[in-house]
Curated annotation (Swiss-Prot):
Name of protein: Phosphoribosylformylglycinamidine cyclo-ligase
Lineage, broadest ranks: Bacteria, Bacillati, Bacillota, Bacilli, Lactobacillales
Keyword ATP-binding: yes
SUPFAM superfamilies: PurM C-terminal domain-like (SSF56042), PurM N-terminal domain-like (SSF55326)
Gene, per the UniProt record: purM
Record-level Gene Ontology MF annotations: ATP binding; phosphoribosylamine-glycine ligase activity; phosphoribosylformylglycinamidine cyclo-ligase activity
Disulphide bonds in the chain: none
HAMAP family named in the record: AIRS
NCBIfam families (alphabetical): purM (TIGR00878)
Amino acid sequence: MSRYQDAGVDVNAGYELVHRIKDAVKSTDRPGVIGGIGSFGGMFDLEKLQVQHPILVSGTDGVGTKLLIAQQMNKHDTIGIDVVAMCVNDVLAQGAEPITFLDYIATGHNDPAKMAAIVSGVATGCREAGAALIGGETAEMPDMYAANEYDLAGTVTGIAEKEELLTTAGPQKGDILLGLPSSGLHSNGFSLVRQILFKDNHVKLTDRPEALRGKTVGETILTPTRIYVQAVLPLVHRKLVHGISHITGGGLIENVPRMLGDNLQAVIDPGRWPQLPVFDYLRVLGGLTKEDCFEAFNMGIGMVLAVAPDQVAQVQEILSNKNMTSYQIGYLRHCLPDTKKIVIK
């Protein structure tokens, strides 16, 4: 054993991991990728995209304490989808197409099988989003993390035609708000979720409460975050959306206003879309108010589009053709600059 291994860092495990993930990484390639893994930096040829006035849009994010659920369940092959989704949905909200992705894993012990499962999930998310996984880092830090612990983060670079960028100047009074359904909790609110389930009520991940309709608590809350890129990007290219909000931390209350100018207010009716069982389950179990729920969770809506009234039918048809359900959940109206930006009926 080398002195480095004696200190807790296994270089050979790192080599094995690279071998294990080669095929998964390669599966995400797209035109423009230069080289492969192992270089000092990932490279991409923007000329291959034939964008007239390219604007790069970057985003970085993690998965929060949802990681603890994956670690407790010893299920690591979907959490990578979450980190990709959190990043690519963010740049999509600016009108950008994700083109490249980098992942970062920090762990106390490099278990090649576990790390490869994580990267496999990252690759799955990248394929779904159309982004190439052009590099990453796995840092073995035995004095920073316990052997079975890891943290996961990602960085995406997207590209947009300058004239297709979405800003707060886009949404207009009278626009209809279309809600795209979430797959569940996505990757936000898990500190509250864990408080309700495990600290206040001693729920087990293997429990199958009637409210969850046959699913275990674990599989319900670990459901991967939905990726909206393939369904929504065609709308951006055709200039059929005025604004996009990715519903992440802070729920609808915090995120819908982020796409609005100072003189607009969103009016949203929760009765316009079906509620997922997990939210009612958490509300009842945690004794949460309506306000608590809408401030912490996406409440079944993962992305909101602002669309001109005369284009709603066309947009919904395009979404349907991409197997994406949509709901007319509200509208935009004029308000004074110091008025609250969203009303939940």
